[in-house]
Amino acid sequence: MIRLKNGPLSPFILGAMTMAVKEMEANTNVRFYNSSKDDENITVGGTTIKLPNVKVNMQTNASQIEGTGNFGLIGGEQIVWVPQDLNNSNKYTQKEVAAFLMHAFCNAAGMFNEQQRKDRDDYVQIYDSNIKPTCKVCFTKQNSNYTMQGNFDMLSITLASSKAYSINPTSINTITKKGGGLIAKNLELSYSDKYFLNDFYLPYIGRTDNWIELDTIVYYRGSKLSESERVQLQDRLNADRGLYGTPPANGRIERKPWS
């Protein structure tokens, strides 16, 4: 579950964020919790820990990395910086902005960008000198501590389009297909994106107690579990905690809309 909060956003960007959340929750096991009203820290045994929130903010200066520079819920607050240019409904559709945010949320959920795969040079050409200096981290090849599933995915929402992160996005490419073909913006989660996220997440419903409650749709190995399979999995997880039966409804946390 991703603890998601937001700073001041226009209705257009906020709507895109809500759209991104709904799209990911409908197609993957990832669930989001609105942590906007929660404390940022928790104290355990005298030690204060900053909670791993993901916060969506508008970019205010060029030193802030577009999207997120962090991969995985590594502790502390992670910021998703939305470029000011995206706050233009005459230039971008809300779906395009939602795709930008889904990409960032996939990074926060633990996915590296597709162009960071160690085998990327077999499929794409990177033009390093054309990339904004603050965004080069989005192209750093991962050679260790990295899970790579399947073949290189040209449809992944995490794959940069040809002019993404460019010092001159109207004319200069940062990445092309091997051989020079352009890479279009991917606006939806690919099959491989969904498979990866579903491998590492379960669709937990937020609760105030120790019960585990799974949402009505659970994906496993590319398939949706039947209701009986979902309940069996939920029962098994609760039995590991010494809890038996159906999680009581009064323990659920009602998710508030982001505003």
Language-model features, listed with the residues they occupy:
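Zinc-dependent metalloendopeptidases
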Residues: 1-259
